[in-house]
């Protein structure tokens, strides 16, 4: 067994990888500028974690794994190179695991985390002891990653950033949607779509490529008519055997909102008999039509792998979400505060719609922390439509991640642009200021959405704390 040192171990992706390495019997250490719940969980498993970075931390390691967020010189990576310690990436490990065992890869611009979690939960509920590697904590699964039975599939949330998903040769893959993102890696929408086409071409059995028919970006991925399609309602596709229009392979119909969440009927199309058959009624505890699609994909994958579909559906009913995915932080004085990872305009729009579905008749107030200068600029014209349904939108300073720029200037420019298109928008400022300004804007009965992929969840925690303070002083 080997000793892996992970630089940037507090991140969702790297902390999940650490759990898989531990499950395989390896020794893991790590460092990061901050600690969090993820590092606390790893420390409880015996992982030595340093806060900060120092060249001495890599001594004794057999390999150093570094997050993609690191650019340029880094003291630990420089020391590792001087000591002859190999530097690995996520892609290196994914390539190795993909060769060791079957991988079910879940790709797409939006919905990867939830669909990955639902797929793993459906498989396990249906009798398949799969492993999983997900970029968020999933309470229903007991964490973000487990190795599981090495002869069973490993469900991987296949991130397209840095083209890392191209390291996989999946036994099965789901593509939820394809919509241009990560302009720092993919300069044009054509570049982005080409990467997904390359990913889809690497699926070993084309009949195990599941594509969402509701998304126009996936259409080009079915190059030979063998892919399986899923979607909502009575959409049709061309059956490659009969050369006639036929129902989708997996269809969600009669979607209804319930007090607990939503329900729908799942149907499948038998390409051998040309018959459309009822599979089961599915109950979900999470809101949003996008989650109906996610659940349909997960159940289709479980069925194709041979899981018990009825048991898989029952397992999905226990899914209450993942960390930072429509995560209810609390309710104080009639105000519900929800944190979500949404940072692309399409995700922001879907999350607002989910809040309106879950909390009908209540005002939805939204805080958005734009994520990276390149994404904010590249998707500029999408923001008004994404935010239009909110009662009030507060725009925080841009989270730069690995990029350089003026976070205040771009945020205030975005506010002016939204206002020009009729959106009730305000400038929120930095984290602490944004929380204060949100508390001043909200009223009893409001639903507050805190959206972003950076440290925006701190705003949610601060809003809860300030509301509790106001309530105590009343």
UniProtKB/Swiss-Prot annotation:
<dbReference type="GO" id="GO:0008360">
    <property type="term" value="P:regulation of cell shape"/>
</dbReference>
<dbReference type="Pfam" id="PF01225">
    <property type="entry name" value="Mur_ligase"/>
</dbReference>
<dbReference type="GO" id="GO:0051301">
    <property type="term" value="P:cell division"/>
</dbReference>
<keyword id="KW-0963">Cytoplasm</keyword>
<comment type="function">
    <text>Cell wall formation.</text>
</comment>
<keyword id="KW-0436">Ligase</keyword>
<dbReference type="InterPro" id="IPR036565">
    <property type="entry name" value="Mur-like_cat_sf"/>
</dbReference>
<dbReference type="InterPro" id="IPR036615">
    <property type="entry name" value="Mur_ligase_C_dom_sf"/>
</dbReference>
<keyword id="KW-0133">Cell shape</keyword>
<dbReference type="InterPro" id="IPR004101">
    <property type="entry name" value="Mur_ligase_C"/>
</dbReference>
<dbReference type="InterPro" id="IPR005758">
    <property type="entry name" value="UDP-N-AcMur_Ala_ligase_MurC"/>
</dbReference>
<dbReference type="GO" id="GO:0071555">
    <property type="term" value="P:cell wall organization"/>
</dbReference>
<keyword id="KW-0547">Nucleotide-binding</keyword>
<comment type="pathway">
    <text>Cell wall biogenesis; peptidoglycan biosynthesis.</text>
</comment>
<dbReference type="GO" id="GO:0009252">
    <property type="term" value="P:peptidoglycan biosynthetic process"/>
</dbReference>
<dbReference type="Pfam" id="PF08245">
    <property type="entry name" value="Mur_ligase_M"/>
</dbReference>
<dbReference type="GO" id="GO:0005737">
    <property type="term" value="C:cytoplasm"/>
</dbReference>
<comment type="similarity">
    <text>Belongs to the MurCDEF family.</text>
</comment>
<dbReference type="InterPro" id="IPR050061">
    <property type="entry name" value="MurCDEF_pg_biosynth"/>
</dbReference>
<keyword id="KW-0132">Cell division</keyword>
<dbReference type="GO" id="GO:0008763">
    <property type="term" value="F:UDP-N-acetylmuramate-L-alanine ligase activity"/>
</dbReference>
<protein>
    <recommendedName>
        <fullName>UDP-N-acetylmuramate--L-alanine ligase</fullName>
        <ecNumber>6.3.2.8</ecNumber>
    </recommendedName>
</protein>
<keyword id="KW-0961">Cell wall biogenesis/degradation</keyword>
<dbReference type="InterPro" id="IPR000713">
    <property type="entry name" value="Mur_ligase_N"/>
</dbReference>
<dbReference type="Pfam" id="PF02875">
    <property type="entry name" value="Mur_ligase_C"/>
</dbReference>
<keyword id="KW-0067">ATP-binding</keyword>
<dbReference type="InterPro" id="IPR013221">
    <property type="entry name" value="Mur_ligase_cen"/>
</dbReference>
<feature type="binding site">
    <location>
        <begin position="108"/>
        <end position="114"/>
    </location>
    <ligand>
        <name>ATP</name>
    </ligand>
</feature>
<keyword id="KW-0131">Cell cycle</keyword>
<dbReference type="GO" id="GO:0005524">
    <property type="term" value="F:ATP binding"/>
</dbReference>
<keyword id="KW-0573">Peptidoglycan synthesis</keyword>
């Amino acid at each position: 067994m080997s000793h892996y040192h992970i630089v940037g171990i507090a991140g969702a992706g790297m902390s999940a990888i650490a759990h898989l390495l531990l499950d395989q019997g390896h020794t893991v250490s790590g460092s990061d500028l901050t600690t969090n719940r993820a590092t606390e969980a790893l420390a409880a498993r015996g992982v030595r974690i340093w806060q900060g970075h120092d060249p001495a931390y890599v001594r004794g390691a057999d390999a150093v794994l570094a997050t993609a967020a690191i650019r340029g010189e880094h003291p630990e990576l420089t020391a590792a190179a001087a000591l002859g310690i190999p530097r690995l990436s996520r892609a290196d490990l994914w390539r190795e695991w993909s060769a060791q065992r079957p991988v079910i890869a879940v790709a797409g611009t939006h919905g990867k985390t939830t669909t990955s979690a639902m797929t793993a939960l459906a498989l396990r509920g249906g009798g398949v002891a799969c492993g999983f590697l997900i970029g968020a904590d999933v309470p229903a699964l007991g964490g973000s990653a487990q190795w599981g039975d090495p002869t069973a599939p490993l469900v991987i949330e296949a991130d397209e950033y840095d083209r890392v998903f191209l390291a996989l040769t999946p036994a099965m893959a789901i593509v939820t949607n394809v919509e241009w993102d990560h302009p720092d890696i993919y300069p044009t929408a054509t570049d982005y779509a080409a990467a997904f086409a390359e990913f889809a071409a690497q699926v070993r059995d084309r009949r195990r490529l599941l594509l969402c028919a509701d998304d126009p970006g996936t259409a080009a991925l079915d190059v030979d008519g063998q892919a399986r399609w899923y979607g909502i309602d009575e959409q049709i596709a061309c059956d490659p055997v009969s050369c006639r229009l036929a129902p989708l392979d997996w269809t969600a119909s009669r979607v209804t909102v319930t007090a607990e969440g939503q329900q729908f009927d799942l149907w499948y199309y038998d390409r051998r008999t040309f018959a459309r058959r009822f599979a089961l009624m599915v109950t979900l505890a999470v809101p949003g039509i996008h989650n109906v699609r996610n659940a349909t994909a997960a159940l289709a994958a479980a069925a194709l792998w041979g899981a018990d579909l009825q048991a898989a559906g029952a397992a999905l009913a226990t899914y209450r979400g993942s960390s930072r995915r429509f995560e209810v932080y609390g309710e104080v004085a009639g105000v519900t505060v929800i944190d979500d990872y949404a940072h692309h305009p399409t995700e922001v729009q879907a999350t607002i719609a989910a809040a309106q579905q879950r909390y009908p008749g209540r005002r939805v107030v939204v805080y958005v922390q734009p994520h990276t200068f390149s994404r904010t600029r590249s998707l500029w014209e999408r923001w008004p439509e994404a935010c239009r349904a909110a009662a009030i939108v507060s725009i925080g300073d841009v989270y730069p991640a690995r990029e350089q720029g003026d976070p205040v200037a771009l945020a205030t420019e975005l506010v002016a642009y939204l206002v020009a298109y009729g959106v009730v928008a305000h400038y929120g400022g930095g984290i602490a200021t944004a929380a204060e300004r949100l508390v001043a804007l909200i009223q009893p009965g409001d639903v507050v959405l805190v959206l972003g992929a950076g440290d925006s969840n701190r705003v949610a925690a601060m809003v809860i704390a300030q509301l509790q303070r106001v309530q105590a002083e009343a």
